[in-house]
Amino acid sequence: AYRSQLKKEGHIKYFGGKQELIRKGAFDDVDMAMMFHVLDTGDKKVLTGPVSNGFIGKEVKFIGKEAHAGSAPYEGINALNAAMLAINNVHAQRETFKEADRVRFHPIITKGGDIVNVVPADVRMESYVRARTIDSMIDANAKVNRALMAGAMAVGANIEITELPGYLPILRHDDMEKVLRKNLEYIGLTDNDIIEGGDFTGSFDFGDVSHIIPTLHPMFGGVKGALHTRDYKIDDEEYAYLAPAKAMALTVVDLLFNEAKEAKDILQNFKPVMTKEEYLAFM
């Protein structure tokens, strides 16, 4: 709600921090970027450069008609039933999602009605539609929209779908990962500790940056619990804080050593998926 208000007032255009940084030119004079996440990788593993899903945000309003739920429910149009049907319609689409596309749809009902003895006429839903590529995001999103509209149509309700720019999938850049791996070994990690690449079906705004410049986004262990939950906690401060900082600092040294030869080679071989201008037009 806070970011929505900022957008309404014109302070921001996108909800993602790095999307705003791209728009405002923060990366215009940046050749490459790196960051890391910590998560429960199991036995303190390091994922050198996991790919991720992108997503499209979605706010949905089902509009029905109020009536007394006890004495005359037949005079109303139940917007909650429309929402429930819509969710089940998406479930019926799941067999059409290819495994390689890693599609995810996980809605929540943020408003299910107003009072228990009135047929719900205003029901709100929020969700992300996630997938592995831009094309599969667009395809899954079209199927989800169709399913949502069918739920409303089935009970005679109306529907309003507001789509919000989400994040793009993270792209791997092998040349940068090779530099990182050398430094992971230098700080004492072994082959048993390092997982090449990685597969993550969550989403990061860093994925947007990876479409424009070479990026590196390793994931380190040192935590327990699922991301964004109450159970998430730092389990090993050395591994969660110091190891990533050391590995990435050493990677910067290697990239800039010898008049930045390594960095220049990476840039020469890099072909951006989008220019900044193309990215902003797409968003």
Predicted regions and their residues:
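Histidine/acidic-residue-rich, glycine-tolerant segments that coordinate divalent metal ions
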Residues: 1-106, 113-118
